Amino acid sequence: MSSSLVGSEMCIRDSYFGIQKTEKVAIHSENRPEWLIADIGVQAIGGITVGLYPTNPPAEVQYLLSHSESKILFAEDQEQVDKALEVLDEVPNLSKIIYFEEKGLFRYDSEKLMRWDEFLEIGKEEYEKNKDFVNFCIDEIKSEDVALMIYTSGTTGPPKASMLSHGNMAVSYTHLTLPTSQY
């Protein structure tokens, strides 16, 4: 499966959940392929990815989800899902928690929870019907639009959000292709 197809299908899925340009989607996970796939889909629709440290305790998870006004949370596993569920009542904007690993979550019962594989099934037909939607979304993104919100660790006070634009990301990607002797 090509990276553009993955991004396109993720874009359609995010749209299915009502994510639109400038809306935030949080990812609470260690580095893994699903993290990148979710991130590509959020950015393709013009949404803003909010990264959470896997070590954030529940109180910080609540603060970050509330402050960023995230609508969806991609969570790695039971540990991260438990943190989100503990503060769910204090995060009214959060409509869905999509988890990557099922271990330990079989008996959890919340309408806000969804398995990653279930999420991936959504939108396959929609993608076939709406391929132009993805190009429309991407064409609407401007280089100055925010792509990522990265929070500080909050050692001197509440965590603060640093916002990186699509233009910032494009410059970073360009530099990844340079030989290391050039920087």
Describe the role of every protein-language-model region:
Residues 3, 35-36, 53, 63, ...:
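Tryptophan-centric aromatic hotspots in well-structured domains and transmembrane helices
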Residues 1-7, 12, 175-183:
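Single conserved hydrophobic/aromatic residue that forms the stacking wall/gate
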Residues 4-5, 74, 113, 140, ...:
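Short aromatic/basic micro-patch
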Residues 17, 44-122, 136:
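Structural core segment of the AMP-binding/adenylate-forming
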Residues 13-59:
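Conserved AMP-binding/adenylate-forming
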Residues 114-117, 124-151, 158, 181:
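Conserved pre-ATP/AMP-binding loop-to-beta segment of ANL
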Residues 47-50, 65-77, 147-150, 158-176, ...:
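AMP-binding/adenylate-forming
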Residues 27, 46, 94, 99, ...:
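Domain-wide signal for the mature, well-folded portions of proteins, strongly enriched
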